């Protein structure tokens, strides 16, 4: 609810009471094709994003100055200033509407830090949606998407959710039909991987012509498998051009991938730039079994069971007054 601070004649004079909480999902790349290094330092990407039920909670409330607090595993390693994408999202949204970014942001982390699941991008998307709601701005979805794309390649998908085909740097999205709920086991590694370092390692490996590094095929079979809803069909088609680079930098991930398949997963893949490994399972009970076995295998820090696709960044309804 908005109440006028003075005569309410301008948007900046309206103050909103309370707070807004947004849930936003992590992602798994079911397919990731990485083009050669461009002159601008980026790579053209074609990817199939898949939002999974591993959710960060972003709460925004009005304050005297912009501040950011994060809680959850690994949160202490994250900067709580302009180096953080969530902070920059608040500044960008405020600039877009001509206001000061005077909000207090609290993020409860469940998506692993530096895990290849776009947790930082998810938090930035959560801030955009939360501020739009808290300040009752009515910024349309297409404009939120444009702001998200300014922040980073993975931020638009965190808004979009579901399953989507991404192109360009990953920010150009087309919705993909997925006829089933797919069940995943996510294995979090003992340490993170820097996305720029993984891309750099891929460039280095590709420059070594003696390696003959394989590349993913076209994405159409993956899209067909999603439309069919058959997890076994999809499992055979999972592919990630960044996986060899992630394995080169973090060889222990090979043990994790092997252990997950030996535990009964249909297939395993490094998610994005890693080091989180995502295992597709035949069913929800199968995922629980795989998760239990993988937990005891000693090959990763933490195991989570998740499903997808799920919605993108969305406001959590406030509890109704009794």
UniProtKB/Swiss-Prot annotation:
UniProt protein name: 4-diphosphocytidyl-2-C-methyl-D-erythritol kinase
Top-level enzyme category: transferase
GO MF term list: 4-(cytidine 5'-diphospho)-2-C-methyl-D-erythritol kinase activity; ATP binding
EC number: 2.7.1.148
Keyword field contains Repressor: no
Active site: residue positions: 27, 154
Reactions catalysed, as given in the entry: 4-CDP-2-C-methyl-D-erythritol + ATP = 4-CDP-2-C-methyl-D-erythritol 2-phosphate + ADP + H(+)
PANTHER family, per database record: 4-DIPHOSPHOCYTIDYL-2-C-METHYL-D-ERYTHRITOL KINASE, CHLOROPLASTIC
Domain of life: Bacteria
Residues that bind ATP: 112-122
Species lineage: Bacteria, Bacillati, Actinomycetota, Actinomycetes, Mycobacteriales
GO BP, sorted A to Z: isopentenyl diphosphate biosynthetic process, methylerythritol 4-phosphate pathway; terpenoid biosynthetic process
Function, in words: Catalyzes the phosphorylation of the position 2 hydroxy group of 4-diphosphocytidyl-2C-methyl-D-erythritol.
Keyword Membrane attached: no
Pathway of action: Isoprenoid biosynthesis; isopentenyl diphosphate biosynthesis via DXP pathway; isopentenyl diphosphate from 1-deoxy-D-xylulose 5-phosphate: step 3/6
Keywords for the protein's UniProt record, in alphabetical order: ATP-binding, Isoprene biosynthesis, Kinase, Nucleotide-binding, Transferase
InterPro entries noted in UniProt: GHMP_kinase_C_dom, GHMP_kinase_C_sf, GHMP_kinase_N_dom, IspE, Ribosomal_Su5_D2-typ_SF, Ribsml_uS5_D2-typ_fold_subgr
